[in-house]
């Protein structure tokens, strides 16, 4: 029986509609809309497209945008000065530096410069430390989106064997901690893991986040597993057209998995939605609409 398709796009639309209604209810109480600043450096087309998507989502929800664009020839000090100004700007609830930065730009100083309470990407060491300690805080958007999707679909996590393939600070490491906090038994695999197929075949939940097209084949998945594909890869088809694919051989794996996310339309929309959710969480805390995360 083919897998259930985990439709992140549909869930994201429902969550964003709920958030839009909440924003309209909060604005009269607070006296201002929530504010998000997305900072982009350079002319990378993919980054530009991602930023446009985030700004359109903000517009739909009634979130004010305070984004800035810097050229690759600009000074890193200018970016840091801008972050300092946004930290102090009471209209701004969330700050995000769009990654990756151009060659020669160190991403660490700007990530450290963001006020942890406005760190809606969840990448400041304080927020990562809170995650490690199991304390409330702003969480990384893609891992949070994966968890919300699993929970919304009623997929059990506690007591399950989960394998996360990919150890990045953006996805693999924080998602492993979130699954562990949800009482899964977690294995974090990576490019140096010997016999990856043996590891993934033992899993009830497999998350692919390595950026290698169709790495996970059908023979690497046990029947009835849940497969989450975080990968986004552009490949050229035999006709010369460009195609967007994930880290999973989707057509083959969906025939034996219990549930699977497509690419596109799976995890990607949830990432943007969790960015918006983090921005609203910061807005509520800073506006005293709630007292904790």
Curated annotation (Swiss-Prot):
Keywords: Amino-acid biosynthesis, Histidine biosynthesis, Hydrolase, Methionine biosynthesis, Multifunctional enzyme, NADP, One-carbon metabolism, Oxidoreductase, Purine biosynthesis. GO terms for biological process: L-histidine biosynthetic process; methionine biosynthetic process; purine nucleotide biosynthetic process; tetrahydrofolate interconversion. One of its GO terms (molecular function) is methylenetetrahydrofolate dehydrogenase (NADP+) activity. Its EC number is 1.5.1.5, 3.5.4.9. One of its GO terms (cellular component) is cytosol. Coiled coil: none annotated. The keyword Metal-binding does not apply. NADP(+) binds at residues 166-168, 191, 232. PANTHER family: C-1-TETRAHYDROFOLATE SYNTHASE, CYTOPLASMIC, C-1-TETRAHYDROFOLATE SYNTHASE, CYTOPLASMIC-RELATED. Homodimer. Catalyzes the oxidation of 5,10-methylenetetrahydrofolate to 5,10-methenyltetrahydrofolate and then the hydrolysis of 5,10-methenyltetrahydrofolate to 10-formyltetrahydrofolate. Belongs to the tetrahydrofolate dehydrogenase/cyclohydrolase family. This is Bifunctional protein FolD. It comes from Synechococcus sp. (strain JA-2-3B'a(2-13)). The lineage of its organism: Bacteria, Bacillati, Cyanobacteriota, Cyanophyceae, Synechococcales.
């Amino acid at each position: 029986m083919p897998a259930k398709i985990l439709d992140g796009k549909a869930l994201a639309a429902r969550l964003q509609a709920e958030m839009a209604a909440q924003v309209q209810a909060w604005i009269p109480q607070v006296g201002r809309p929530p504010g998000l600043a997305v900072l982009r450096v350079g002319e990378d087309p993919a980054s530009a497209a991602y930023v446009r998507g985030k700004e359109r989502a903000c517009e739909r929800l009634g979130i004010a945008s305070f984004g800035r664009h810097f050229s690759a020839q600009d000074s890193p000090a200018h970016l840091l000065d801008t972050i300092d100004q946004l930290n102090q700007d009471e209209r701004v609830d969330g700050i995000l530096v769009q990654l990756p930065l151009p060659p020669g730009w160190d991403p660490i100083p700007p990530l450290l410069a963001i006020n942890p309470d406005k760190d809606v990407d969840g990448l400041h060491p304080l927020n990562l430390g809170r995650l490690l300690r199991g304390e409330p805080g702003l969480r990384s958007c893609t891992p949070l989106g994966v968890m919300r999707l699993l929970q919304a679909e009623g997929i059990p996590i506690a007591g399950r064997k989960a394998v996360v393939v990919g150890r990045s600070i953006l996805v693999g490491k924080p998602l492993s901690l979130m699954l562990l906090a949800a009482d899964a038994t977690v294995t974090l695999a990576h490019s140096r893991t010997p016999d990856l197929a043996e590891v993934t075949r033992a899993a009830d939940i497999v998350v692919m986040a390595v950026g290698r097209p169709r790495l996970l084949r059908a023979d690497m998945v046990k029947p009835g597993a849940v497969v989450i594909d975080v990968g986004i890869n552009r490949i050229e088809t035999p006709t010369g057209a460009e195609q967007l694919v994930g880290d999973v051989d989707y057509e083959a794996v969906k025939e034996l998995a219990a549930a699977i996310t497509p690419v596109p339309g799976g995890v990607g929309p949830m990432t943007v939605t969790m960015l918006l959710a983090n921005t609203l969480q910061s807005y509520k805390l800073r506006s005293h609409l709630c007292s904790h995360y």
